[in-house]
Amino acid sequence: MVKQHSYNRDELLLSGHGRLFGPGNPQLPSPNMLMFDRITRINEDGGQYGKGEVVAELDVHPELWFFRCHFAGDPVMPGCLGLDALWQMVGFYLGWIGGHGAGRALGCGEVKFTGQILPDNRLVTYNVALKRVINRRLVMGIADGSVAVDGETIYEATDLKVGLFQNTGELNGA
């Protein structure tokens, strides 16, 4: 597979069906849980740590599913969905560099919310800077991330961890 440095919505949807990195390899969630419309930049040597970065965007419009249920009369994008987008991006990165297995979020350090995403906003920009990538028997990415809406940073998360697993049953003690 030739590495691209950006991906459109249709290409991301292929990932959700296991057709971008191949069967048994990392895949993004399908809609509605896919939390971005495109990846505008992905590389192995960018970001603040020089170990890789991913930048993705979500177009905001009032019809997005979460505005109908969170909250009635006070619509706001749940902060956990922005955090999940950052984990999705770390998992995508691990597949992009050739990691094998199913991706799972493993945790994070600190999370700080200083703003919100509302139906009248226009654009969410997610940024992930890889701090460490382990690509041996264990495949794991550790990154810092941020979420901006209409150019203003509103969430920050440190030490986002995603691992790739050959047998996800191991996570439940099976």
From Swiss-Prot:
<keyword id="KW-0413">Isomerase</keyword>
<keyword id="KW-0444">Lipid biosynthesis</keyword>
<dbReference type="GO" id="GO:0005737">
    <property type="term" value="C:cytoplasm"/>
</dbReference>
<comment type="subunit">
    <text>Homodimer.</text>
</comment>
<keyword id="KW-0963">Cytoplasm</keyword>
<dbReference type="GO" id="GO:0006636">
    <property type="term" value="P:unsaturated fatty acid biosynthetic process"/>
</dbReference>
<protein>
    <recommendedName>
        <fullName>3-hydroxydecanoyl-[acyl-carrier-protein] dehydratase</fullName>
        <ecNumber>4.2.1.59</ecNumber>
        <ecNumber>5.3.3.14</ecNumber>
    </recommendedName>
</protein>
<feature type="active site">
    <location>
        <position position="70"/>
    </location>
</feature>
<keyword id="KW-0443">Lipid metabolism</keyword>
<dbReference type="Pfam" id="PF07977">
    <property type="entry name" value="FabA"/>
</dbReference>
<dbReference type="InterPro" id="IPR010083">
    <property type="entry name" value="FabA"/>
</dbReference>
<dbReference type="InterPro" id="IPR029069">
    <property type="entry name" value="HotDog_dom_sf"/>
</dbReference>
<comment type="function">
    <text>Necessary for the introduction of cis unsaturation into fatty acids. Catalyzes the dehydration of (3R)-3-hydroxydecanoyl-ACP to E-(2)-decenoyl-ACP and then its isomerization to Z-(3)-decenoyl-ACP. Can catalyze the dehydratase reaction for beta-hydroxyacyl-ACPs with saturated chain lengths up to 16:0, being most active on intermediate chain length.</text>
</comment>
<comment type="pathway">
    <text>Lipid metabolism; fatty acid biosynthesis.</text>
</comment>
<dbReference type="InterPro" id="IPR013114">
    <property type="entry name" value="FabA_FabZ"/>
</dbReference>
<dbReference type="GO" id="GO:0034017">
    <property type="term" value="F:trans-2-decenoyl-acyl-carrier-protein isomerase activity"/>
</dbReference>
<keyword id="KW-0275">Fatty acid biosynthesis</keyword>
<keyword id="KW-0276">Fatty acid metabolism</keyword>
<dbReference type="GO" id="GO:0019171">
    <property type="term" value="F:(3R)-hydroxyacyl-[acyl-carrier-protein] dehydratase activity"/>
</dbReference>
<keyword id="KW-0456">Lyase</keyword>
<comment type="similarity">
    <text>Belongs to the thioester dehydratase family. FabA subfamily.</text>
</comment>
